[in-house]
Design a protein with these regions (language model features):
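Catalytic core of pol beta-like nucleotidyltransferases
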Residues: 1-23, 31-37, 48-99
Length: 99
């Protein structure tokens, strides 16, 4: 299923701007195109400003209300230099970048 046909991307962009997200990408089943009806949405983000756990939780909850499915959020800063991070970055598809 195409990610952009499933979600209201304009509503998501509203929240990306509200939370000062600099870049957001999907990875996992939606990025690979092998998602199913019960798939969650895996996203990796980075912020333009300092952020805390409450920002991540708030953004996660707001995105789940838009996408109507669970969202797993990672930050680029939290990735370590290992094969897991390399796999995420290799399959990531950009969905938002602040101008």
């Amino acid at each position: 299923m195409d990610f952009f046909n499933v979600v209201d991307i304009d509503a998501a962009i509203h929240f990306f701007k509200q939370y000062n997200v600099r870049k957001a990408a999907i990875f996992g089943s939606y990025a690979r195109g092998d998602d199913h009806l019960n798939s969650d949405i895996d996203m990796i983000i980075t912020f333009t400003e300092k952020y805390d756990l409450l920002d991540i939780i708030g953004l996660k909850q707001d995105l789940e209300s838009v996408f109507k499915r669970p969202v797993d959020l990672l930050t680029y800063e939290s990735l370590r230099d290992d094969s897991f991070a390399a796999n995420i970055l290799a399959e990531a598809k950009l969905v938002y970048e602040k101008n």
